[in-house]
Amino acid sequence: KNGAEIVPVYSGSQTLVDAVSECMRYWVSNCDNTHMCVGSTVGPNIFVKICGWSTSQISRELKLQLKSKFKRIPKKIKLINCVGGGSSAYGFWSDFIDYDKKQIELIGVEAGGPQKSKLHAAPLTNDAKLGILHGAAAYVCQDAEGQINNTESISAGLDYPGVSPLH
């Protein structure tokens, strides 16, 4: 039969961080016959590079479209995107990161959690500390002992307790 086998995650809070953890756990236990690819710029450097490179096509295309429409990159433009795992933000911004901030302003929007919850998944706006998550140093929501906090978000893809090491 064709198609992927979908394996639900029943560990932890059953969110994206747990799915990535289970994926990595399976991969390291089956390295001889398995390869893994993560759809976000998280985890060990090679996965960040693979995902970052593939999503950067979005930025290259945006640059082409801007030049086609305006004959150049506009003198003042804002590029806004959700930040979290990092793939869409990096993909959208990668060709513009080195531009002067006065010309191109990059705006990242972080999803929080439910208003009554203290489990907000917004590491950049909630004083996250540098930590290690999925084999990468990044800003992570963690407790005083360095343990990863549970997080919540209205969006399943934005409940990751850290940000991409690219951020």
Go through each PLM region and give its residues:
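Inter-helical turn/loop segments and adjacent helix faces that build the functional surface
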Residues: 68-79
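Buried hydrophobic positions in well-ordered alpha/beta secondary-structure cores of metabolic enzymes
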Residues: 23, 62, 79-81, 86, ...
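Active-site/ligand-binding loops adjacent to catalytic centers
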Residues: 17-46, 70-72, 98-101, 108-167
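Generic structural signal for well-ordered, non-membrane alpha-helical segments
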Residues: 12-20, 51-59, 85, 89, ...
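Phosphate/ATP-binding catalytic cores across multiple sugar-kinase/actin-like superfamilies
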Residues: 55-70
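Short glycine/serine/threonine-rich phosphate/pyrophosphate-binding segments
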Residues: 1, 82-93, 116-118
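Residues at the starts of beta-strands that form the adenosine-phosphate
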Residues: 5, 103-105
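A glycine-rich helix N-cap at a beta->alpha junction
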Residues: 2-16
